[in-house]
């Protein structure tokens, strides 16, 4: 693992993030090949994100690659302060561990399965994982204790699911769309930097 990968994927405290000048945000990255979702506290990700969030390598949920061309930002979660952003990140990681390790059999019962009892897929892509990540994001924000407001910036607005589900939360949540990308790798970095600049205005 490179030193850069170690640096960007290490867990960060609220104090560190604030001192380093990062906005109180977290990032959900979608795997274009398999539908898996990875969480990051920084607008980057590394090997440790993979190792800590994908604990159980198996045929239905193989440990994903770090290749930059297969990950795209699905959602940028803009929390009101760094403590809230860290709490939501920790909640997401705990829910992932519960789904994949502690209560895997129970979680499987609620997933769309094919006639062989496997998580439904098309090619290698399993939409269940992105749907679960959105559900877990809602739960994580709800349990964070945040007073809001929270802004969710989506890759596509339809990924948020039903707006009425988000309106159940007892805090102000705004939804908007990320700018459309051309060259995914180059433009995505520029777009995330632009979001950071907008937050400082």
Curated annotation (Swiss-Prot):
GO molecular function, one term: single-stranded DNA binding
PANTHER family: LARGE RIBOSOMAL SUBUNIT PROTEIN ML67 (PTHR28184:SF1), MITOCHONDRIAL HOMOLOGOUS RECOMBINATION PROTEIN 1 (PTHR28184)
Species the sequence originates in: Candida glabrata (strain ATCC 2001 / BCRC 20586 / JCM 3761 / NBRC 0622 / NRRL Y-65 / CBS 138)
An annotated GO BP: mitochondrial genome maintenance
Function: Transcription factor involved in regulation of RNA polymerase II-dependent transcription. Also involved in regulation of mitochondrial DNA recombination, maintenance and repair, and generation of homoplasmic cells.
InterPro entries: Ribosomal_mL67
Keywords: Mitochondrion, Nucleus, Ribonucleoprotein, Ribosomal protein, Transcription, Transcription regulation
Protein name: Large ribosomal subunit protein mL67
Span of the signal peptide: none
Gene name, Swiss-Prot/TrEMBL: MHR1
Family matches, as Pfam families: Mhr1
One Gene Ontology cellular component: nucleus
Keyword Lipid metabolism: no
UniProt family annotation: Belongs to the mitochondrion-specific ribosomal protein mL67 family.
Top-level taxon in the UniProt lineage: Eukaryota
Subcellular localization(s) per the UniProt record: Nucleus; Mitochondrion
Keyword Protein biosynthesis annotated: no
């Amino acid at each position: 693992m490179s030193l850069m990968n170690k640096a960007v994927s290490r867990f960060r405290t609220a104090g560190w993030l604030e001192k380093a000048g990062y906005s109180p945000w977290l990032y959900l990255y979608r795997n274009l090949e398999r539908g898996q979702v990875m969480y990051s506290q920084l607008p980057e990700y590394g090997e440790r994100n993979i190792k800590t969030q994908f604990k159980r390598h198996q045929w239905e949920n193989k440990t994903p690659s770090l290749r930059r061309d297969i990950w795209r930002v699905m959602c940028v979660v803009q929390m009101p302060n760094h403590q809230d952003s860290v709490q939501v990140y920790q909640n997401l990681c705990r829910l992932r561990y519960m789904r994949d390790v502690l209560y895997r059999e129970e979680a499987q019962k609620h997933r769309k399965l094919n006639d062989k009892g496997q998580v439904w897929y098309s090619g290698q892509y399993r939409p269940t994982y992105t749907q679960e990540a959105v559900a877990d994001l809602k739960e994580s924000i709800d349990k964070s204790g945040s007073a809001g407001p929270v802004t969710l910036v989506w890759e596509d607005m339809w990924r948020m699911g039903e707006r009425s589900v988000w309106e159940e939360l007892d805090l102000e949540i705004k939804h908007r769309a990320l700018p459309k990308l051309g060259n995914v790798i180059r433009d995505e970095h520029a777009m995330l930097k632009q979001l950071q600049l907008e937050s400082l205005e």
